[in-house]
Amino acid sequence: MKTCLTRSLAVIGICLSAGTAMAADVYSPMAPEVQQTTTETGWTFSFAPYFWAAGLSGDIAQFGLPEAHVDASFSDIFDHLDFGAMAIGEARYGPYSIFADVMYTKISGSAGTPRGILAVEVEVSSETFAGLLGAGYSIYEDNAARIDLVGGMRVWSVESDLSFSGGILDGVSRSDEATWVDGLAGFRATYSITPEIYLTGWGLVGAGQADLDWDVAAAIGYRFSDTISAVAGYRALGVDYSDDGFVFDVVQQGPILGLVVRF
């Protein structure tokens, strides 16, 4: 029971945070806007809280436990979620852009052990942070389309705590954590079908402390006004990281929904 709970909560925590992450529309860091309204200084800004209904599949290992294959559905997440926050911000000046994507989640749960000898109950909590900071440059632009070349660094940080109550291990606790950084590069693009409706997407790939880190998405958006727009689509993100018994080799994918405010 302890092993299953530990693995389950670790998967759910990383699944919620990973990312990643980028469910905004063409005003977002991962999808450039062709018709943004500039300020008097020439800068444009956008902020986009978003929601990514991502499931997760792959292999993980924490707390020195054997590597396990996992397949966590999205319905498992809300049973253990304590707090979650995801948002994107971008500043653009002409063909240049600077963007950030931040995700943080905290999850927890508990369960009784099968025999109650080593412990009567085990509690697990996990905090996960994932942040991407990058820059872009428009390599093509016309009245309907724009293509940006982008690059950046993504930081992952995962910390899990395990506490035992009752039995031989009463009062014993253990922590496991990992932090790593990857560099990514790729493209983002948008195409306006009408003044209100547009298509957008991106593709990033890289590595660093992870052997592989990649992120792709496609979406359709709708502009309600000059300051408010929304987007819906699908995103997939994969990362392959392992170090000193900590393994995170997974693919996360699912629908995205975002609301963008421009100022």
What is each stretch, according to the model?
Residues 197-211, 236-237:
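Transmembrane beta-strand segments that form the barrel wall of outer-membrane beta-barrel proteins
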Residues 56-82, 102-130, 156-180, 208, ...:
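Extracellular/periplasm-exposed beta-strand and loop segments of Gram-negative cell-envelope proteins
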Residues 212-262:
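Predominantly the C-terminal beta-signal and adjacent terminal strand-loop region
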Residues 79, 143, 181, 204-215:
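Solvent-exposed loop/turn segments connecting transmembrane beta-strands
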Residues 22-104, 258, 262:
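Short glycine/proline- and aromatic-enriched beta-strand/turn motifs that initiate or cap beta-hairpins
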Residues 95-100, 142-145, 195-199, 227-230:
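Repeated loop/turn-to-beta-strand initiation elements of outer-membrane beta-barrel proteins
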Residues 1-10:
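Bacterial N-terminal signal peptides that target proteins for export
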Residues 47-49, 87-91, 133-137, 151-153, ...:
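Residues on the lipid-exposed face of transmembrane beta-strands in outer-membrane beta-barrel proteins
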